[in-house]
Amino acid sequence: EIDVLCGQYMENLIAKITLSRERVDVLSEKDKKMLAKVIIAQIMRVPRSLEHISKKIYPDVMKRVREKAITSLPACLIEEYRQQIMEIELPEQNQKESFFNFAFTPENFDRYCELIQDGAWFVFVNAQREHMPFFTSDNPVLVEATGSGKIGVFHNGLANPATTLFYPLCPSIAVAIFSNRSIVGVAAKHLGIDGRKLTISEPKYVMDKNLKIIEQAYLHSFIPQPCFDIFIDEINNEFVEGVY
């Protein structure tokens, strides 16, 4: 279902946004529901999430499981089998499968989706797209905390009122989601501008988001060819100046 949403549905949504007038509400409740599924799936299945599960969460979970298994043994067997039980490890593939089975059960997945679906959504059209388009990466949903500047879902948490999400749909369009308990979220709901299409003309804003998306990337960032060519030219110029 997620792969289907990333295909024709996303193309249709981008077309609808592109053809809509400025400052109108372009996201329906259905759109937000569909986008929430795409965004949560992207957050959960990127390598960074799997790495965090493997290195941070899995060891704590397994420690509790082992201790519980030991205490469930008859007293006469505890000392004999304690060490063997404490050395039990799941293969990495089983760790991933356990995580996906937990995260993508309907009740858990829907709960994560509802956290962001109920937020305040804005659709940003990039007026700088010709020379400064939105970038993306192999970790495409930018999760950041207002104020602290921390990025990444495991540094912030989806339920944190300070957490905002930024997700480029294409080089010219992105969605931003604010908690409905944040100042922006409360104001947006009160003013009735949830789902509003707005034009971003400030280059600094676009550059800030692009740099954070690159910073949050696991291995790869995806930069449109014209921007990439400019970066390569600048690197070459700096190299030549350094040599001479």
Regions inferred by a protein language model and the residue ranges of each:
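Alpha-helical structural context detector biased toward long hydrophobic helices
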Residues: 1-244
